[in-house]
Regions:
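Short, solvent-exposed loop/turn segments that connect beta-strands within catalytic domains
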Residues: 12-13, 87-91
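Short aromatic-glycine-enriched beta-strand elements
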Residues: 12-17, 73-82
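Glycine/charge-rich catalytic "coupling/switch" loops of P-loop NTPases
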Residues: 22-72, 89-92, 97-127
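Internal alpha/beta loop-helix hairpins
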Residues: 1-25, 44-45, 50
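Short strand-coil-strand connectors
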Residues: 19-21, 83-87
Length: 127
């Protein structure tokens, strides 16, 4: 669960922008006024990881952060605990689950900087 606040609506693209300690998120338009606090549910399986700033993709939410912890969470699966936000600033902790193969190919390790990619359609409003 991520606590956010609505900061903007884009009526042309029917999107809402929300702010939180880890950055900004865009999602399908919410029919709530600017300034409204919104709790979002973000599933670990809905977060992809990049080790360099990604370019040329359709993902609307790309958030900088670092790997706080990582552990095996099932056969062939690794769960990463991520701290989203700029280094040295308060951030937001989320979890991402990726394959062990992906973690190995990316040479992921604790403390490394990452970019979390989150599809807008993966965000769900928690009332």
């Amino acid at each position: 669960i991520i606590d956010t606040t609505i900061i903007d609506h884009d009526d042309f693209d029917t999107m809402t922008t929300l702010a939180f300690d880890g950055g900004l998120l865009c999602m399908s338009r919410l029919n709530l006024p600017v300034g409204t606090p919104v709790r979002l549910r973000l599933m670990a399986r809905d977060i992809a990881i990049a080790t360099q700033p990604p370019v040329g993709h359709s993902i609307q939410n790309v958030l900088q952060g670092f790997i706080e912890d990582m552990h095996e969470s099932g056969p062939g699966q690794i769960t990463l605990t991520l701290q989203l936000g700029k280094v040295g600033k308060p951030g937001t902790q989320v979890q991402a689950t990726i394959t062990a193969r992906a973690a190995r190919k990316l040479n992921l390790t604790k403390g490394w900087p990452i970019w979390a990619l989150i599809k807008s359609v993966a965000l769900a409003n928690e009332f």
